[in-house]
């Protein structure tokens, strides 16, 4: 039976905004300068008078100014064209664009609902509660707000009025808001859909700030026969071409590097070479660095070798693990005729994967059987690959646009409670944004445009889970943490699918829903089973997931999770769903910083004190502000709190430092003004040696101290050693000024609380 359809749009009541009060007026603002420097003090970016809410950190300000402001074509007060200067412009152009497109195609019940939608989105962005993926910041609203067009770049879209595939006529009238793409590649060299065509399709994606993943398993292995005679040069030779092409492109022009995922099935003839590709290249890098080449990731050593511009993953079916458990062999098969080309002990394959991942963090593993068991649309084909960060897994030639909710904005630190209603409201609000973004988007190929329209996948997620748990005083690796995380994730995904079904009630389900209806409803019911931890209720699942354990989960969160999934299934059974997928949990790298998140995505904190190097140069020192709040909640006094934080972060000053301090520096010949410069630079330094240089102090200072320019101009010059300080003295001063980067061993910290501050790195 076909799904029901009604005639009505979405209604939005106010949650965070106020009637007759502009959302822009709900915040106080600062005008700040944004300067990004290399560790040696050299400026790589500078912009003055950047307007942001006072609550935004300098890091969020710098990300906005350097990465997300439109840098040209924006009308200025004097009538000229220039760049964006305030977050108000960015929030307006994005929220207004979503409102305009949604209103144009009947997404809202009334004009008032559309206005509330717009104002709540502006508030959400300015409050850092939820923001979209980077391509939205780069592209969305440039045409509506500023009239920016640009020549067509070979993109396509499906016109919702007549459902016909059309070629875009400009670069920005329909933006490219999608961050995640999965493209197919056929075993063909030069024709459409083949190997060389893939690099062109990838280039269109990279240019507008997005990333792409592809499964290359169709391409025949080395020495397989070619139709015209001779033998194939093999997959690896072509992967190196794609790697070079990606490395030559900065996605978004000046925003970030190309993002690329390469997937390969575990039975491909060249799988062992693929597994060890980066291992061998890292050996070459080590040799080049030993010979004196730059060891930075953008240095000449890494630029010389291959394999540095993609994440690599192997697709592993359950049948491999059966062979592994039985100490059997694993067969590698020809792409052309399926014959067995090689049989290798499964243990050897697994050991090589583990060794390679240990050596260079690649390849990742994607569990093909499980992924396809949770596939909502198997009638459309198998899931073969993922996007570069591996959160989006769906059909080839589809795209996904993301948004991430900042969980800390819904966490009440006074009683460790979570604002379920506010979180559900925000989920519904932004699921609507992501659906509208599909409506307005253009895509890099005909296939991607058509299938993205047909399936309408979205990627709502969250960030700052690790920080929220840390502030709560709950260890990340604990049953209680898993209960809370499972419930919050279930609420988000359930409400997102409920919203999708709500939109389907008046817009209709996605075009390919009916043929996948039973499969999708089976997957939805399996999600509901996980919310109830009903192990016997799963259908079509070989390896059952861990459900939400009631004994470890706060009751109010568990009730909200099960209700969300009851509603999602009930409405879906009646109306279908507007979107084939709704949620993913992305790493939220750059958008996490603009929301001032201490932790990204679902991950634990990477480190308590972090230094993020930006593409193109520059560093940020990031200190996890969850630590002092967590210590306070755990009952530590302010003095104990300060001592623990200073142990990890450092005092950011030479006042009182051992050996190298204001007094000893005066004795060495530094002036008070020069010492003040050093103390100022110490606030963002991650090693004191980096600030004792000509960029911080000036050539006149170094000359006065007795050093010739040819000496201090040498990059290997160490001023502290030249002044007579010993290595032990420098280390002691460095720990005091810049911190130890860990709380382990900190004064007053109790052993039973160490696990709360555990990190992905061994430095918590």
Residue ranges of predicted features:
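Extended catalytic cores of very large enzyme megasubunits
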Residues: 1-764
């Amino acid at each position: 039976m076909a799904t029901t359809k009604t005639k009505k749009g979405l209604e939005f009541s106010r949650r965070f905004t106020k009637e007759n009060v502009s959302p822009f007026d709900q915040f106080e603002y600062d005008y700040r300068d944004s300067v990004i420097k290399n560790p040696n003090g050299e400026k790589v970016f500078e912009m003055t008078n950047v307007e942001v809410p006072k609550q935004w950190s300098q890091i969020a300000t710098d990300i906005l100014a350097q990465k997300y402001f439109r840098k040209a074509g924006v009308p200025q007060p004097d009538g000229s064209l220039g760049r964006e200067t305030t977050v108000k412009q960015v929030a307006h152009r994005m929220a207004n664009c979503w409102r305009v497109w949604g209103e144009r195609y009947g997404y809202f019940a009334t004009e008032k609902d559309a206005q509330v939608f717009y104002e709540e989105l502006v508030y959400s962005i300015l409050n850092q509660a939820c923001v979209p993926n980077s391509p939205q910041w780069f592209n969305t609203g440039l045409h509506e707000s500023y009239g920016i067009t640009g020549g067509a770049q070979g993109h396509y879209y499906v016109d919702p009025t007549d459902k016909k595939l059309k070629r875009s006529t400009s670069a920005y009238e329909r933006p490219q808001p999608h961050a995640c793409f999965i493209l197919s590649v056929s075993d063909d060299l030069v024709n459409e859909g083949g190997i060389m065509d893939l690099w062109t399709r990838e280039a269109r994606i990279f240019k507008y700030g997005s990333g792409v993943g592809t499964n290359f398993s169709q391409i025949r292995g080395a020495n397989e026969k070619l139709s015209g005679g001779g033998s194939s040069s093999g997959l690896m030779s072509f992967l190196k071409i794609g790697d070079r092409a990606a490395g030559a492109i900065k996605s978004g022009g000046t925003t970030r590097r190309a993002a690329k995922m390469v997937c390969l099935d575990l039975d491909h003839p060249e799988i062992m070479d693929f597994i060890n590709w980066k291992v061998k290249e890292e050996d070459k890098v080590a040799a080049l660095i030993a010979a004196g080449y730059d060891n930075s990731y953008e240095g000449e050593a890494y630029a010389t070798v291959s394999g540095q511009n993609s994440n690599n993953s192997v697709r592993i079916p359950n049948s491999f693990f059966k062979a592994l458990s039985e100490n059997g062999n694993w067969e590698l098969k020809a792409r052309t005729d399926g014959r067995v080309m090689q049989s290798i002990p499964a243990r050897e394959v697994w050991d090589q994967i583990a060794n390679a991942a240990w050596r260079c963090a690649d390849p990742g593993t994607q569990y093909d059987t499980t992924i396809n068991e949770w596939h909502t649309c198997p009638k459309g084909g198998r899931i073969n690959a993922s996007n570069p960060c591996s959160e989006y897994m769906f059909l080839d030639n589809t795209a996904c646009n993301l948004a991430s909710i900042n969980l800390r904005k819904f966490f009440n630190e006074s009683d460790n409670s979570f604002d379920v209603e506010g979180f559900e409201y925000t989920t519904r609000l932004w699921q609507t944004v992501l659906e509208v973004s599909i409506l307005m988007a253009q895509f890099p190929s005909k296939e991607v445009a058509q299938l993205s329209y047909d399936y309408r996948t979205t990627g709502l997620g969250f960030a700052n889970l690790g920080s929220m748990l840390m502030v709560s005083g709950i260890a990340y690796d604990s049953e209680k943490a898993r209960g809370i995380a499972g419930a919050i994730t279930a609420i988000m995904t359930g409400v997102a699918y409920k919203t999708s079904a709500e939109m389907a009630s008046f817009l209709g389900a996605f075009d390919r829903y009916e043929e996948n209806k039973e499969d999708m409803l089976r997957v939805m019911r399996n999600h509901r089973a996980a919310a109830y931890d009903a192990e016997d209720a799963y259908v079509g699942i070989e390896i059952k997931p861990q459900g939400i354990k009631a004994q470890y989960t706060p009751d109010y969160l568990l009730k909200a999770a099960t209700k969300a999934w009851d509603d999602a299934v009930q409405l879906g059974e009646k109306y279908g769903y507007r979107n084939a997928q709704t949620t993913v949990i992305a790493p939220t790298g750059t958008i996490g910083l603009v929301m001032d998140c201490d932790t990204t995505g679902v991950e634990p904190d990477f480190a308590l004190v972090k230094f993020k190097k930006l593409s193109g140069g520059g560093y940020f020192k990031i200190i996890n502000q969850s630590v002092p709040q967590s210590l306070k909640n755990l009952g530590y006094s302010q003095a104990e709190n300060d001592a623990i934080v200073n142990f990890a972060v450092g005092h950011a000053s030479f006042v009182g430092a051992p050996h190298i301090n204001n007094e000893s520096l005066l004795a060495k010949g530094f002036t008070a003004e020069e010492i003040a410069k050093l103390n100022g630079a110490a606030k963002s330094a991650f090693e004191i040696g980096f600030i004792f240089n000509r960029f911080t102090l000036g050539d006149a200072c170094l000359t006065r101290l007795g050093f010739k320019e040819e000496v201090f101009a040498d990059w290997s010059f160490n001023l502290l050693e030249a002044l007579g300080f010993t290595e032990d003295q420098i280390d002691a001063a460095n720990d005091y000024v810049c911190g130890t980067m860990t709380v382990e061993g900190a004064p007053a910290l109790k052993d039973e609380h160490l696990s709360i501050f555990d990190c992905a790195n061994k430095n918590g």
